[in-house]
UniProtKB/Swiss-Prot annotation:
The gene is rnfC. NCBIfam families: PRK05035.1, rnfC. This is Ion-translocating oxidoreductase complex subunit C. Residues 465-477, 485-513, 602-614, 658-671, 770-782 have a biased composition (Basic and acidic residues). Residues 465-568, 580-677, 692-793 are annotated as: Disordered.
Length: 819
């Protein structure tokens, strides 16, 4: 720090590297005093006119505002407010064309002036020393003052950041642009106010040295400042040589001290602060006169403007209106520049307003402006590097900008570029280098801004997560404290900790589950370890016994719940047999016809009884069909006994005994069987018909041949009917079996009446053959059955035995007759 002051106090001037001497055109505008333009009717005030963020609106559409009234309010020193340049009504707040080469829109307040130009209430002061540094900085901030030299950095923020660090305060009056003369005229005409503003700033910062630097091409301004100082030694004046860009911050500091500001750092890092002379004037007006920054001096120059000079211009005035008031000759072939020819920006739309940034409006003609020549390839001549006042390598930065290699651009210190435009001015290939560098800076800024927002979002997220975790921990701690208090309360009342007891129960339960899951084993005789299945086998045995018990219970229930209809039918059949037997014993051969009729009546009664029984029963049991067949056989035997001789009677008794045995076997079988198959009933009917036919043949002799043929046909018909019934019906209806039995009885009765005993032997043999055929049909039927029940097999065996016995007796009888 002492080095900076010592080098400055030496009085020596250092020349910076590079720089140029462009043709100077200041005389066009600096010969006329400062003037005011007519007050306009419409003003467009952008919400942001500085390097920072936009303030918050204090007004709305339709509001009436006064001159100097704040329209926005900031939350920090970098968020400067804007003020009404005159009194009037707020017509709208919407996007409007910006004073920028892009021509984009930005939020803007449209103020329609009322022509009264009425100020707000002001509180001017004479002695600024009555206020503290903080109060003065705050008033500077409230006035919306930004750097008027071109950077438009918020002045209050700049002063506050450099407070207690500044040893050398430099007031920049160099104004190195070849066309701009606003600072020159301001120093000539308002030197006293500039000096007062410098002293206000010195009061705030307390620097050891204060100096005003002015180029040697402004002798009138130098003289005016010296006259304003009146011999005071608190502020020094340094006249520097004219060279572009000596007005740049780093170059001017080097000129006065010979010290370079480190790359990427501010001048305050070496104890130096720099402000523009226009900014000093604005500070004086804000502190002493209590006037915000609502107007500034603007240079109107160029051969296209008739009335060249420097004018006081209200901020927000459309540029087209200013040029019109200054006698601008509109020509679409020649652009308008905001700023000087070296650093100025071409304006695409003249309706854009004047802002704090605009210090000059340049309207050149064909003598001052030529169309840019076509860009050519870089020839690596190094002219740009030689002329660069910041010691950069513009040709390298150009390649990095074109390839969008942002990392390399930053490595080659693109941020140190002051955009002076010298590189483009000296380039023989006519490459607009300054445009490439501005675009590259904008891209890098966007990337960093995006990264900054991402980092801020990450910080907010992490802070939120930390807060949520902290709240969760606090909640758990509260819950634990409440649970602990509850446990202590229960322990005091019951003498046992409930949580501890619950944990013990849980441990015991887990231990039991562990024991139950262990596999039991046993060791075999060979020493092998095998799983112990004793428990499993016991469980299986218990289940098997339970199933058997359930099955026996079901059988007992079925036996107990059998319908009584079957028993009634069996009783009726037994009564019929007894009656028929008595009638057979009492009647003689002479009364055969009447006995036959009586038997026939009995058969009809029995049939009607059976049919009634069938009608009264909702589901006829196959047992009834078997009983009916037995009755038919008994009646047939009785008729045969009546029509035969004494030997036939004995044979009939023998047959009756056989039928009784067969019936008893059938009844036993029926008792053992819960459901007789319908096919068995049909088989029994066929057997009965065969027996009846055989007996009839034994008792008849006169018409043996014809009767035998008739019987054969009847048997064949019966057999075919039975077979068809078996084929067409999967389960024969019991009623059909009863009908078949009745038909068999009728046929047997007719055969008994017609047959004689002459050809008994042949007829007996024929009947025997029929019985054998019937037996074979029965056996086939039994073999074709899909699932033969053991009970059915027992019934079939009993029938077979009865038939065999009957045939043996019949043969013996026939042999006796032949003898």
């Amino acid at each position: 720090m002492a080095d900076v002051l010592s080098r400055f106090n030496s009085g020596k001037l250092w020349d910076f590297k590079g720089g140029i001497h462009p043709p100077e055109m200041k005389s066009q505008s600096n010969s006329q005093p400062l003037r005011h333009l007519p007050l306009g009717t419409d003003f467009y005030i952008p919400l942001k006119q500085h390097l920072g963020t936009t303030g918050n609106l204090l007004i709305k559409e339709g509001d009436y505002v006064l001159k100097g009234q704040a329209l926005t309010k900031g939350d920090g020193l970098r968020m400067l407010p804007v003020h009404a340049p005159t009194s009037g009504t707020i017509k709208s707040i919407k996007p409007y064309v910006a004073t920028h080469p892009s021509g984009l829109d930005e939020p803007t307040i449209h103020l329609q002036a009322d022509g009264l130009d009425q100020w707000i209430e002001r509180n001017p002061i004479d002695d600024f020393s009555t206020l503290s540094s903080e109060q003065l900085i705050h008033k500077i901030y409230q006035a919306g003052i930004a750097g008027l030299g071109g950077a438009v950095f918020p002045t209050a923020a700049k002063i506050q950041s450099a407070e207690q660090k500044v040893k050398l305060l430099i007031i920049n009056g160099a104004e190195c642009e070849p066309y701009i003369t606003c600072d020159d005229r301001l120093m000539r005409e308002r030197a006293d106010e500039i000096i007062k503003g410098i002293r206000i700033l010195r009061y705030i910062l307390h620097p050891e040295k204060v100096v005003i630097a002015i180029e040697d091409n402004k002798p009138e301004a130098i003289s005016a400042i010296r006259n304003a100082l009146q011999g005071a030694n608190d502020i020094s004046i340094r006249v520097i040589p004219t060279k572009y860009p000596s007005g740049a911050t780093k170059q001017l500091i080097y000129l006065l001290t010979g010290i370079e500001v480190p790359s990427g750092e501010r001048s305050s890092s070496i104890g130096v602060l720099m402000q523009n002379v226009g900014t000093m004037f604005a500070i004086k007006r804000a502190i002493i006169n209590d006037e915000p920054l609502i107007e500034r001096v603007v240079t109107l120059t160029g051969n296209k403007i008739a009335e060249k000079g420097n004018y006081w211009v209200r901020l927000g005035t459309p540029i087209s209106q200013i040029l019109s008031d200054a006698g601008y000759q509109f020509d679409k072939h020649f652009p308008i520049f905001a700023g000087g020819p070296m650093m100025g920006l071409e304006l695409p739309n003249l309706n854009a307003p004047v802002t704090k940034l605009v210090n000059c409006l340049l309207a050149p003609d064909y003598l001052e402006y030529a169309e840019p020549e076509a860009e050519q390839a870089c020839i690596r001549c190094s002219s740009c590097s030689d002329a660069c006042p910041v010691n950069l390598m513009p040709q390298q930065l150009y390649w990095f900008a074109r390839s969008e290699d942002h990392k390399k651009s930053e490595e080659y210190a693109l941020k140190d570029c002051i955009e002076c435009g010298i590189c483009a001015y000296v380039c023989p290939s006519h490459i607009p280098l300054i445009q490439y560098f501005r675009q590259e800076k904008a891209k890098i800024w966007q990337i960093k801004e995006k990264q900054k927002k991402s980092d801020e979002a990450k910080i907010r997220f992490e802070a939120k997560q930390a807060r949520m975790e902290r709240e969760e921990q606090e909640r758990k701690a509260r819950s634990q404290r409440a649970a602990q208090a509850r446990r202590e309360e229960l322990a005091q009342t019951k003498g046992e900790d409930p949580v501890k007891a619950a944990l013990e129960r849980l441990k015991a339960k887990k231990a039991n589950e562990t024991e139950s899951t262990q596999i039991k084993t046993l060791t075999s005789e060979k020493g092998e370890v095998l799983p112990d299945n004793t428990d499993l086998m016991a469980q299986r045995k218990a289940r098997r016994l339970a199933r058997q018990q359930a099955a026996s219970q079901v059988e007992n229930q079925e036996q107990q719940t059998q319908p009584t209809n079957a028993k009634k039918a069996a009783v009726a059949a037994a009564l019929a047999r007894a009656k028929a037997k008595k009638l057979a014993q009492a009647n003689s051969t002479s009364e055969a016809i009447s006995n036959s009729q009586t038997a026939e009546n009995q058969v009809e009664k029995t049939k009607s009884a059976v049919e009634k029984t069938q009608e009264n029963s909702t589901a006829l049991d196959p047992k009834k069909a078997a009983v009916a067949a037995a009755i038919a056989r008994a009646k047939a035997k009785k008729l045969a006994q009546t029509n035969s001789t004494s030997e036939a009677i004995s044979n009939s008794q023998t047959a009756e005994n056989e039928v009784e045995k067969t019936k008893s076997a059938v009844e036993k079988t029926e008792e053992n069987s819960t459901a007789l198959d319908a096919k068995k009933a049909a088989i029994a009917a066929a057997i009965a018909r065969a027996k009846a036919k055989k007996l009839a043949q034994a008792n008849s002799a006169s018409e043996a041949i014809s009767n035998s043929q008739t019987a054969e046909n009847e048997v064949e018909k019966t057999k075919s009917a039975v077979e068809k019934t078996q084929q067409n019906s999967t389960a024969l209806d019991p009623k059909k079996a009863a009908v078949a039995a009745a038909i068999a009885r009728a046929k047997a009765k007719k055969l008994a009446q017609a047959n004689s005993t002459s050809e008994a032997i042949s007829n007996s043999q024929t009947a025997e053959n029929e019985v054998e055929k019937t037996k074979s049909a029965v056996e086939k039927t039994q073999e074709n059955s899909t699932a033969l029940d053991p009970k059915k097999a027992a019934v079939a065996a009993a029938i077979a035995r009865a038939k065999a016995k009957k045939l043996a007796k019949t043969q013996a009888t026939l042999e006796n007759n032949q003898e």
